[in-house]
Regions:
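N-terminal ligand-binding/catalytic initiation module
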Residues: 1-77, 311-316
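Conserved phosphate/anionic-ligand binding catalytic regions in large, soluble enzymes, centered on
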Residues: 1-6, 70, 75-84, 241-253
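Glycine-rich beta-alpha junction loops
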Residues: 2, 41-42, 135-140, 246-248, ...
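Rossmann-like adenosine-cofactor binding region
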Residues: 138-240, 245
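Adenosine-phosphate binding glycine-rich loop
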Residues: 209-317
Length: 317
């Protein structure tokens, strides 16, 4: 790994780092060995620089060696927003299990990057809406939800300044609360932390529990501290879903990108989305069934742990 932060660096600096990093890494990766993908700080630009250096060093066209690539050199449609899309599909399965529907649901999320934007877009498509979203500078409350042209503006705002969401409030005349997170607001149906690790600590978890909101769906990698997560799991009125299952859509579509690369095909966005939806339904199903099999009821955290452990154990046996 590395501790290089691309924030504030010039394109030339980022390119030089990516080239140097790949020069050290390329011997240990390959389409059938290990396939890195993007994450925080590693977007399409960085993947492009990394792949360019890989090709320069190897002298071959192995576009399956990295995922999250641009569409002109082997990328997949909806890969950037796949984690967010998948999280909403997982939420949809949770609601079905609880004899509920996603139609009309109000979501409070943190983050408005690729993951958060994916949640906003897919929620709007399925009849729900994100009414709260938080950024580094505070949170937005838009009772009408982030839909339509507002989704396009989020992309524009993020490209200009990813550290401030206040311009959204200024443009649409909605509430902005500076320096705060939206954990604890009561006029929502679902909480979805989708920004960074340890976003929700014990103080926030207590506010979430007190709000009376039933659904807590982790999306970012480990967005809840261990003590806060255990506290929320102990709330009888709540359903808690773990990030290790909920955010699998991103790596799932990375797998679909590799499949397209292997077959020399480019699938439509609808084809990729349908495969992603099927994938998330199955992830929820096996997690719920694993928990039930071991007498744990509808404990999705335990179910995901058990299902994941069993799959690895069976593969190693």
């Amino acid at each position: 790994g590395s501790d290089f932060d691309p924030a504030g660096k010039s394109d030339a600096e980022v390119m030089r780092f990516c080239q140097s990093f790949m020069t050290a890494l390329y011997r240990y990766i390959g389409p059938d060995i290990d396939v890195p993908a993007g994450d925080m700080g590693v977007g399409g630009r960085e993947i492009g620089y990394l792949y360019g250096q890989y090709r320069r060093l190897k002298g071959v066209w192995e576009n399956g060696v990295l995922t999250g690539k641009g569409m002109t050199y082997g990328g997949s449609l909806i890969r950037p927003e796949a984690t967010g899309y998948g999280a909403v599909y997982y939420l949809q399965e949770v609601l079905k299990h609880e004899n509920d529907t996603i139609e009309g649901k109000r979501l409070a999320i943190s983050g408005y990057g690729n993951v958060g934007w994916g949640i906003m877009k897919k929620a709007a498509e399925l009849g729900a809406k994100v009414t709260y979203f938080a950024g580094p500078d505070g949170y937005i409350h838009d009772p009408d939800g982030v839909t339509g042209e507002k989704l396009d503006y989020i992309l524009e705002m993020r490209a200009k300044d990813p550290m401030h969401c206040k311009p959204y409030a200024d443009k649409y005349g909605v509430e902005f609360v500076a320096g705060e997170k939206c954990w604890g607001v009561k006029d929502v149906d679902v909480y979805m932390p989708a920004a960074t690790q340890n976003d929700v600590r014990m103080e926030s978890a207590e506010k979430i529990a007190a709000s009376g909101v039933k659904y807590y769906i982790e999306v970012a990698n480990m967005p809840t501290t261990n003590d806060a997560l255990n506290f929320l799991r102990g709330q009888k009125h709540m359903v808690v879903a773990p990030s290790k299952a909920v955010n699998a859509g991103g790596v799932g579509v990375s797998g679909l990108e590799m499949s397209q690369n292997s077959e020399r095909l480019s699938w439509t966005a609808e084809e990729v989305d349908a495969q992603l939806h099927k994938m998330m339904k199955n992830i929820h199903k096996v997690s719920a069934e694993a928990a039930e099999e071991y007498g744990l009821g509808y404990d999705l955290v335990a179910g995901a742990n058990i299902a994941g452990f069993k799959k690895v154990a069976e593969a190693m046996y």
